[in-house]
Amino acid sequence: MTIPMICIAILGALCFVLGLNVSAARTKAKLGSGCPSDPKDPLHKAIRAHANTAEYAPVLMILIYIASQAQMASWVLWTMVVATACRLLFVAGILLPRSMSRPNPMRFIGALGTYITGVMLAVAVFIQGLG
């Protein structure tokens, strides 16, 4: 059960680190609330990375935890790892490029991978529920 716990820890830490990044970017921009509309703005990118992570990471963490509570097939374990990697890739795809205005392969693969692995984990939990 170590791998699921590591995935959950990474996703949880990612959410908090990105939240801290938003706070730091707000301090630097001297903007206590709101979001700049410029997709090149570091605060805009920080907010989008954190907000998107806050949407998906908790659901993935719950699915990973529930799936880990039963005897699981190896594909379920690998799906947990890939889901976690996809979230990291997505965040990198937002924060690393100069602007969010252009399509980015890291962001695309991270998002698509999150959707696919999220559904796979939900199916695994559903199958577990059937007994």
Task: Annotate the PLM regions.
Residues 2, 42, 46-49, 71-74, ...:
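Juxtamembrane loop-transmembrane helix junctions in multi-pass integral membrane proteins
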Residues 2-31:
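N-terminal signal-anchor transmembrane alpha helix
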Residues 7-10, 47-50, 79-82, 106-113:
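Physicochemical signature of membrane-embedded alpha-helices that form the seven-helix bundle of GPCRs
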Residues 20-48:
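Cytosolic, membrane-interface loops and tails of multi-pass inner-membrane proteins
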Residues 51-64, 118-119:
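Core segments of transmembrane alpha-helices
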Residues 64-86:
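Short alpha-helical packing/oligomerization segments
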Residues 89-117:
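Interfacial loop-to-transmembrane junctions
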Residues 122-131:
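Juxtamembrane boundary at the C-terminal end of a transmembrane helix
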